[in-house]
Amino acid sequence: MIHEVAHQIAFNCGVHNRFSTVPKWTSEGLATLCETRGVYNFKKFPSIRDRINRSRLESFRRLKAAGKTDGRLLELLQSDRLFETEPEVAYAVSWAISFYLNENRQAEYMDYLRKDARRGDFLKHSRLDRVGFFVRHFGKNIEGLEKRMNIFVESIK
């Protein structure tokens, strides 16, 4: 339920634009972040341990061990198709990258979300547009970013 409420709040408060094509990894990743008490009640639960979504972490680790997450970040950046073909993988990687960015590159992540919400109404973004927009905020070494994300997620206790 908190996940769906997070979507509504994000759209109602302008974090996402209802009239724009929001990359699904962005909206679902943010909603999965909000499923934890450390995000929705951060004053009472300020520890990073309270911000870790344990079920998403377990899912990501299981899928990674099975070799199903490697290279999927670029795929998510290019299109939303992975949510149709392998939704568990899509949600796991969306949570992992969102958690990594929120914990390690928060200013850039917030800037990305802010600018994504202002990209214009009723625009369809090509695969190149979607990746280019991400690269402008986080750099062109997507493979390196994915490696750093994996190291970070693997380090979580």
What does each model-found stretch correspond to?
Residues 18-157:
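Acidic/His/Gly-enriched intrinsically disordered linker/tail segments
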